[in-house]
Amino acid sequence: MGKRKKSNTNRLLVLVIVLAAVLAGVICLYINVVKDDPVFQFVKHLFSPDNGADTIRSRRTASDKPYDLTDNQRYYKELVNKNSINVLIIGPDETSGSYDTLMIVSLDDRNNTVKLINIPRDIYIDYSNEFKNDLKKAWPKYASSKGIYKINASHVLGKRVDYKNGEGRFKNPEYDFTADIIEEVFNVYIDDIVFIKPSSLRKIVDYFGGVEIDVPYLMKYSDPVQNLKIDIKKGLQTLGGKDAEGFVRYRQGVDEKGKYKSIGDIERKKNQVAFVKAFISQHLNIKNLGKIITIFNDLNSYIDSSVSNPEQASDYGKVAEKLYRNKFIQESEEIECKSVDIEGIYYLELRRN
């Protein structure tokens, strides 16, 4: 990924990967519409006899970490099949730059399942002394930065130490460090990364006519700094793009009596998974496949990905088509953790081995 420029066509193909995780099978229609040279390469590879999932797995390389990044911090159980293809979806906070959303979309072509794993952003990362020493050299006052041990700040630390000198598999110290932390702590290898801003969610939801969902409680919150205003009533309703963004971002506000209410990161992750499930169940159908084509150009500026060429895109297309054809099973996994106070900062502590 890094800083290299991508052509508009490649960006469109990258977007296919995001939508393949949500709307499996769309690529089959896409290849019949776009007709420039890179897409012909995409088509040629898509219909080659190679297995897309096997090709993606063959691109895997060892993490080659300089040392253990954590103090033997390991989640207590396995989250995915070792042969699953795992795409990390990143959604940033538009004001702070921290990662507001970290979601793993795990595609298991052998067991025909798509698993969504939302990683709570407040998870405490128990960094190793080796890493802390390197961090102190690069950033002497890092310890004074509040919440720096949260997983949603991992990319900041990766950038500070110039992790792997920008020569890791994603060619980006922020993404490489975050991916290696996830692999070390959760034993989930990240095959590719998709960086998507909240504004993209608005456009996708509006284009498909909204998402019907049962909102569990009043969501009312206002933050002028983030240009964020959430006002969603409790109950079954269809959310447009703006409210859909508010639904997945909501974490605190006021209740029906005007009193302060906080649902915490774990509850917010449950809402996000519920939203994704609702979107898939309502819009994963043949009649909606054609809609994807017309929104590519409008969304590509909001999305970046480690999948940057037609051949890689078509490998995901094969996986998506296979899962869709076999009527895949959709699952979700909640990360088990508990609230803790560490030096006056709120964190979530993982259940460990």
State each model region's role.
Residues 2, 27-353:
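Non-catalytic, solvent-exposed segments at the cell envelope interface
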Residues 1-12:
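N-terminal Lys/Arg-rich, disordered targeting/topogenic segments
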Residues 14-28:
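Hydrophobic membrane-insertion alpha-helices, especially the h-region
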